[in-house]
């Protein structure tokens, strides 16, 4: 089979794939035990979704607000942390007050009709639209949390909100981390008016609702006056940044569990190294030295992950080839390129 024929066959397979039957998985997240409904994609669906996102990235990234973070390459929580630290330490006048808010049941509430209408205005390829609509319709309401396409579609859906806040409301410092948002300002009344305008925009333009627990408060200053900002897993003060307590507790519990095992698993190693990435970029070394360092050897964990990763790409390649050939494709004459994309900042 020629390369052109193989590519054509692969495209036909992607365009004509059908959604699998899904059983929702319920997880209870964080110390608040918040219930989340996850739709776990099959290997076939995951492969198709990655192909779609790779093709659609130019559209998703065009016009994206520069301080929109989460689930985007190079835009994890650590990058957002650096930006907020720069704002609060170099421009204290415009960071006197904070408006903190998020969207109620964001993924579960995105209206299909509005999302599809927005896609129709931008995409003129009927096959791509049909494929995207098929994925969106996996759930009757909202978009499926757990699908690779969902994080890109949801970020893209809120682009208009980002530009409304920055350009029409003239927010000096504004950041969005998926559906969590913060706006810094010098005037409390102005932030309250912004909050109302944002709430109206969400309802009228996007069919979404601002959660009722929004806050406007005086940011940390002087000798323990004002409040710290809890955002993206960090707690920001005027002169330091520490980890959110819940994340630090998870890290210490994981370290203690590993210390009681004869041998750490690869999942243990990855999770603990992810926590180390968070600890390294915050002012929490004393807590790390007291509670975590005595329990685990990070050098051993790094070696374990390194050894595993040497064989991981080969296993993924073989699985993709098996899936492709099982669907009627020919593996000979076709080279599958497997590229690992991950951001340590998004591991929590």
Where are these regions (language model features)?
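Generic amphipathic alpha-helical segments used as scaffolds and interaction surfaces in large
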Residues: 35, 39, 43, 68-71, ...
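Short acidic (Asp/Glu) and glycine-rich catalytic loops that position anionic groups and cofactors
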Residues: 29-31, 60-64, 97, 177, ...
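Compositionally biased, low-complexity linear motifs
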Residues: 4-6, 117-122, 165, 242-256
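Conserved two-metal-ion catalytic palm core of "right-hand" nucleic acid polymerases
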Residues: 1-115, 124, 137, 141, ...
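Right-hand nucleic-acid polymerase module
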Residues: 46, 50, 138, 192, ...
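A common structural junction motif
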Residues: 199-208
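Conserved polymerase palm-domain catalytic core
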Residues: 9, 13-14, 82-178, 182-200, ...
């Amino acid at each position: 089979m020629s390369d052109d024929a193989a590519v054509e066959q692969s495209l036909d397979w992607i365009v004509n794939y059908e959604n699998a039957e899904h059983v929702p998985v319920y997880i209870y997240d964080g110390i608040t035990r918040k219930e989340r409904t996850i739709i776990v994609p099959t290997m076939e669906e995951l492969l198709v979704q990655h192909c779609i996102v790779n093709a659609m990235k130019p559209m998703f990234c065009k016009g994206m607000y520069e301080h929109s973070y989460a689930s985007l390459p190079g835009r994890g929580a650590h990058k957002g942390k650096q930006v907020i630290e720069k704002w609060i330490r170099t421009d204290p006048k415009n960071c006197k007050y904070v408006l903190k808010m998020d969207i109620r049941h964001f993924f579960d509430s995105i209206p299909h009709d509005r999302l599809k209408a927005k896609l129709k205005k931008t995409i003129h390829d009927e096959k791509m639209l049909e494929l995207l609509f098929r994925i969106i319709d996996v759930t009757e309401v909202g978009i499926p949390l757990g699908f690779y396409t969902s994080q890109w579609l949801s970020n893209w859906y809120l682009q208009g909100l980002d530009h409304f806040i920055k350009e029409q409301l003239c927010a000096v410092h504004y950041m969005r981390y998926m559906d969590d948002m913060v706006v810094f300002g010098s005037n409390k009344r102005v932030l309250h008016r912004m909050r109302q305008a944002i709430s109206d925009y969400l309802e009228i333009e996007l069919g979404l609702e601002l959660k009722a627990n929004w806050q406007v408060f005086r940011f940390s200053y002087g000798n323990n006056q004002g409040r710290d900002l809890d955002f993206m897993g960090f707690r920001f003060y005027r002169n330091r940044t520490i980890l959110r307590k819940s994340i630090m507790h998870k890290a210490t519990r994981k370290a203690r569990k590993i210390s009681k095992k004869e041998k750490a698993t690869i999942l243990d190693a990855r999770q603990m190294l992810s926590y180390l990435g968070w600890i390294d970029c915050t002012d929490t070394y004393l807590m790390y030295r007291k509670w975590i360092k005595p329990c685990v050897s990070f050098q051993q964990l790094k070696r374990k992950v390194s050894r595993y990763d040497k064989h991981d790409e080969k296993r993924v390649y073989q699985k993709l080839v098996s899936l492709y050939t099982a669907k009627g494709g020919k593996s000979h004459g076709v080279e599958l390129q497997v590229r690992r994309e991950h951001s340590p900042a998004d591991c929590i």
